């Protein structure tokens, strides 16, 4: 006798009354999945329909749990890559809503009734804000690096310091991107010291560009030196080459004074190289995008590359980026949430923590601590903050809070909530959620 005959038919499971409330495609998928999984591990004479249905409902609930959800970032990492990096202000979202939910003039000129430029309005604002000749936007900074190198240096050679051949999250490695772009890499210097003469001695007839990459996600300390972009640009100009700064994470305006030391400002850097690029959702505090600034003739070459079609941004990205740029131009920095969280003073953070502590039914301790910038930015810098610590097994508490979409951290064997990254409009929700939890 075929032992699998004891399994109920898939259709019988799908049509069961207990699964009636679930959409057909979802319950059909999980009915097939659970039956297949149990058949692989089938050592019993029979299996009940009730057990199958229990497993199916469990899988469906897990599926819904895995959907994209909002969380409260109590980790103390402001630009938390795994939590979506920069947060968009509600007012900026409302300003974009009409564009996103309707047809729009994303690529249509309302003046002459003809096809328009997808980037026109955003590029105009970028040129105003950064005082650059021209600009371009692609879907992230990795795409920007690839497009710049492929457009300007294909089948040529690029010089880069060994100390700047970085790897960022997701195993994105600068040398691999250079290779994928059809460009040959010439490494100069050592991991801790690179001099101007190293670049100069490496130049040959096949050299097209000198690349500088900002070490945004790690810091070199002790016996080390590097060449600034201004000097590299002068060398490139003298040798009739191009200079490119892969900035990754740069700041624009109104950043906490404790953070800006030795941290490059975009408007200054754009005057010191031929072309540069950075991420829109890091210190700039907007949406994911690769923003490229530079000489007009170079940006034109990028626009002619067929790859741009594959890397272009959609109306959602353009809408949110446009509103972020307007906020910067109007000096309305409160609407750039990343800046606000980095700039919040300690007394304001303490007030948030005290308000929550006062209303919680569980015992906590208020302590000073340190927050991080995150997002591959400023690894050697931290910001003062206040945390609430909870009594009990730290790992169990971290898991329990995570199930309620509250992401804290473990510090000194204690589970803590960091109030620099908890926004004021989340406090009441945080209080209600914690107070509804049991057996902490």
UniProtKB/Swiss-Prot annotation:
Residues that span the membrane, as ranges: none
Pathway membership, UniProt: Aminoacyl-tRNA biosynthesis; selenocysteinyl-tRNA(Sec) biosynthesis; selenocysteinyl-tRNA(Sec) from L-seryl-tRNA(Sec) (bacterial route): step 1/1
EC number: 2.9.1.1
Main location: cytoplasm
Gene: selA
Any one Gene Ontology cellular component term annotated for this protein: cytoplasm
HAMAP family attached to this UniProt entry: SelA
Organism (species): Campylobacter jejuni subsp. jejuni serotype O:2 (strain ATCC 700819 / NCTC 11168)
Protein name, entry field: L-seryl-tRNA(Sec) selenium transferase
N6-(pyridoxal phosphate)lysine PTM positions: 282
Subcellular location: Cytoplasm
């Amino acid at each position: 006798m075929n032992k699998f005959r004891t399994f109920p038919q898939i259709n019988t499971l799908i049509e069961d009354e207990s699964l009636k409330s679930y959409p057909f495609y979802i319950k059909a998928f999980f009915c097939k999945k659970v039956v297949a999984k149990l058949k692989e591990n089938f050592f019993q004479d029979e299996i009940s329909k009730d057990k199958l249905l229990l497993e199916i409902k469990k899988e469906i609930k897990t599926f819904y749990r895995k959907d994209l959800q909002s969380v409260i970032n109590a980790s103390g990492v402001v630009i938390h890559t795994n939590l979506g990096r920069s947060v968009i202000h509600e007012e900026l979202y409302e300003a974009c809503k009409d564009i996103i939910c309707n047809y729009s003039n994303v690529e249509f000129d309302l003046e002459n009734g003809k096809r328009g430029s997808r980037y026109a309005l955003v590029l105009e604002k970028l040129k105003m804000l950064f005082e650059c000749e021209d600009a371009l936007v692609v879907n992230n900074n990795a795409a920007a690096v690839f497009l710049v190198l492929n457009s300007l240096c294909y089948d040529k050679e690029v010089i880069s310091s060994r100390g700047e051949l970085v790897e960022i999250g997701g195993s994105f490695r600068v040398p691999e991107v250079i290779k994928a772009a059809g460009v040959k890499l010439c490494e100069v210097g050592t991991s801790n010291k690179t001099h101007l003469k190293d670049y100069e001695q490496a130049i040959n007839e096949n050299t097209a560009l000198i690349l500088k990459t900002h070490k945004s996600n790690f810091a070199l300390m002790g016996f080390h030196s590097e060449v600034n972009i201004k000097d590299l640009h002068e060398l490139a100009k003298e040798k009739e080459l191009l200079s490119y700064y892969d900035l990754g994470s740069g700041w624009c305006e109104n950043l906490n004074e404790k953070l800006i030391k030795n941290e490059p400002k975009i408007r200054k850097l754009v005057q010191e190289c031929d072309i540069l690029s950075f991420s829109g959702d890091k210190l700039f505090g907007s949406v994911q995008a690769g923003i490229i600034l530079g000489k007009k003739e170079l940006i034109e070459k990028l626009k002619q590359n067929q790859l741009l079609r594959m890397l272009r941004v959609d109306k959602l990205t353009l809408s949110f980026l446009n509103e972020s740029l307007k906020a910067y131009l109007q000096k309305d920095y409160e609407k750039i949430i990343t800046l606000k969280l980095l700039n919040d003073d300690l007394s304001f953070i303490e007030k948030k923590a005290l308000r929550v502590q006062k209303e919680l039914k569980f015992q906590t301790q208020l302590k000073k601590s340190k927050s991080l910038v995150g997002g591959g930015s400023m690894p050697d810098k931290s910001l003062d903050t206040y945390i609430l610590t909870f009594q009990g097994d730290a790992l169990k508490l971290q898991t329990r809070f995570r199930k309620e979409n509250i992401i804290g951290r473990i510090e000194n064997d204690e589970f803590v909530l960091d109030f620099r990254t908890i926004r004021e409009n989340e406090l009441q929700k945080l209080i209600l959620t914690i107070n509804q939890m049991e057996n902490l």
